[in-house]
Structures are given as C-alpha cells and as structure tokens.
Regions:
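DUTPase catalytic domain/fold
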Residues: 1-164
Length: 164
C-alpha cells in the first residue's frame, strides 16, 4: 500500500524501519513545544494521505493462509496508528492518549503529546524517534440489540477472572 505524504518541515524524516522485520515505522520529532507544565507536543513535520487501493485487501498469516479478504468497493476505513516505542521507559514520558489514530481524512501535521511524569528523567528532543506508526483499519459495524447473548465458558467473568 502506498501512503502519500507532504513534507511540512525541511528536517522531516520519512517513517522508517530499523530492521525489515519490524512491525512499525519509527517517526522523528522536528519540533517540540511545552503546551502546559510538563506536557510536551512534538511534531513530525509530515502530513499524510491514506487511501485504499483499487485491489482487494487481503490479509494472510505467516504461513500465507488467507484469513481476511475485503473485496474492492467495500467500505474500509484506513488510519495510521501512532504508538509509543518500547524505549519510552527511558524518558519518564507517557503518550497522552496511549495510541493516537490519524484518520484517513486528516491532512494536518502528525504530532504527539506526552506527559513528562518523571521530570528528573530525560525527555524527548528534536531529532529523537518519538513513536512508531502502523497501518490500521476498521470495517463497518452494525450493532444489533438482542434479548440474550450466547453462552461461553468465561461467561461474565471480568477483571482478573482468568488468573494472574
């Protein structure tokens, strides 16, 4: 899939993988702004255009077995999901919304807001890899109200019901 982008900052870095097998693409900060005490907004200097292609969307497992096919012409909403990198623990920062969703209709600069919850630890600076993105999608959902739901072994067991 091709994701088009517009460079909004001369130092913007095209999202990249360190290793070909990596699941997500790293993004690099081109700007930083403290928008409230210990709350930092980082821009990546890029805007995206995310579109489905003319072909069917086919998703396969690692063995090549197809387990989802969305025929051309079916409604599929595509997004980029921005999430923290695993090394975030070294910064004392927390991504404000855990995972940010960049909708396919958004055309502004992609940015991320972090809480610097441990001010004695370093925070991100311009030029740092501040997060990672991956393609996400959702299919249309119709909600149907029923009087009863089917039984399962788990039933209504909620928080902690499956063990430690």
């Amino acid at each position: 899939m091709i994701v088009r982008f517009k460079r909004l900052h001369p130092d913007a870095v095209v999202p990249f993988k360190t290793y070909p097998e990596d699941f997500c693409y790293d993004v690099v900060a081109t700007s930083e702004q403290e928008i409230a005490p210990n709350v930092w907004k980082y821009g990546i200097g890029l805007a995206f255009e995310i579109q489905g292609g003319p072909e069917d969307l086919v998703i396969k497992n690692e063995f090549g077995k197809e387990f989802l096919r969305i025929p051309q012409g079916r409604e599929v909403n595509v997004s980029l999901d921005l999430r923290p990198r695993s090394s975030i623990y070294k910064t004392g920062m927390v991504l404000s919304n855990a995972v940010g969703t960049v909708d396919d209709l958004y055309r502004g600069e992609v940015s991320a807001v972090f809480y610097h919850v441990f001010p004695n630890m370093p925070r991100y600076k311009v030029g740092d890899r501040i997060g990672q993105i991956k393609l996400g999608f959702t299919l249309p959902i119709e909600f149907e109200e029923v009087d009863e739901l089917g039984d399962t072994e788990r039933g209504e067991g909620g928080y902690g019901s499956t063990g430690r």
